[in-house]
Amino acid sequence: MVRYKATISYDGTLFSGFQRQRHLRTVQEEIEKTLYKLNNGTKIIIHGAGRTDAGVHAYGQVIHFDLPQEQEVEKLRFALDTQTPEDIDVVNIEKVADDFHCRYQKHLKTYEFLVDNGRPKNPMMRHYTTHYPYTLNIKLMQDAINGLVGTHDFTGFTAAGTSVQNKVRTITKATVSRDEKTDFLVFTFSGNGFLYKQVRNMVGTLLKIGNGQMPVEQVKVILSSKNRQLAGPTISGNGLYLKEICYEN
């Protein structure tokens, strides 16, 4: 068997997330169906570096899969790209070592979250940004977001019911700025891993701070108390993008 690593992008609007689910359309299912056709009915299982939720998009999701025979990578990329649905793009494919695993290999993930703060909202972007029509103080959010950088237990920012035991993660970059062209707010987070709905919960909290409903110090309070009830709401995922995954070595 030969192992391949692929970088893919997708519009998450019509997907029920990345991971295969019974009777639901997912990114994993569509790619596996295409690989099945390309390999004469051989079942191929793909593995993803991140499991994006319904409606969440990706510019740089990484997957890996094993094929029975070695193939020329550009021909494989082109075939997979042209035969998957229009809302999936296969950006790059490369042959990797047999022990490479896109999820467990040490890596850095970057997520981006777009917020339309306009009144009225931009209806053309309703699937690609999350609308927040209330007044926001970006300076307050910038002060608060700095408290997320570093190694912390992010229990207070994860969704209830997660099966993950170790909730310590390291965030190396956390910024918020306003895009001058679109006027959207752009939240960017880079780190060695993120918990279930962590990014959406962090953005929901920062918006509350920007609106004056929570103090700037609330981020540190949530981290120290590990209390999800003290954080903001889980904001809708249509503004969330898995932007990039960088592997060591």
UniProtKB/Swiss-Prot annotation:
GO molecular function, one term: RNA binding
Reaction equations catalysed: uridine(38/39/40) in tRNA = pseudouridine(38/39/40) in tRNA
UniProt keywords, alphabetically: Isomerase, tRNA processing
CDD domains to which the protein is assigned, alphabetical: PseudoU_synth_EcTruA (cd02570)
Enzyme Commission no: 5.4.99.12
A GO BP annotation: tRNA pseudouridine synthesis
Domain of life: Bacteria
Database matches in Pfam families: PseudoU_synth_1
InterPro entries reported in the protein's UniProt record: PsdUridine_synth_cat_dom_sf, PsdUridine_synth_TruA, PsdUridine_synth_TruA_a/b_dom, PsdUridine_synth_TruA_C, TruA/RsuA/RluB/E/F_N
Disulfide cysteine pairs (residue numbers): none
Active site (catalytic residues): 53
Binding site for substrate: 111
Role noted for this protein: Formation of pseudouridine at positions 38, 39 and 40 in the anticodon stem and loop of transfer RNAs.
Family recorded in the similarity comment: Belongs to the tRNA pseudouridine synthase TruA family.
Annotated NCBIfam families: hisT_truA
Subunit structure, interactors included: Homodimer.
Protein name in the entry: tRNA pseudouridine synthase A
Species the sequence originates in: Streptococcus pyogenes serotype M3 (strain ATCC BAA-595 / MGAS315)
Lineage: Bacteria, Bacillati, Bacillota, Bacilli, Lactobacillales
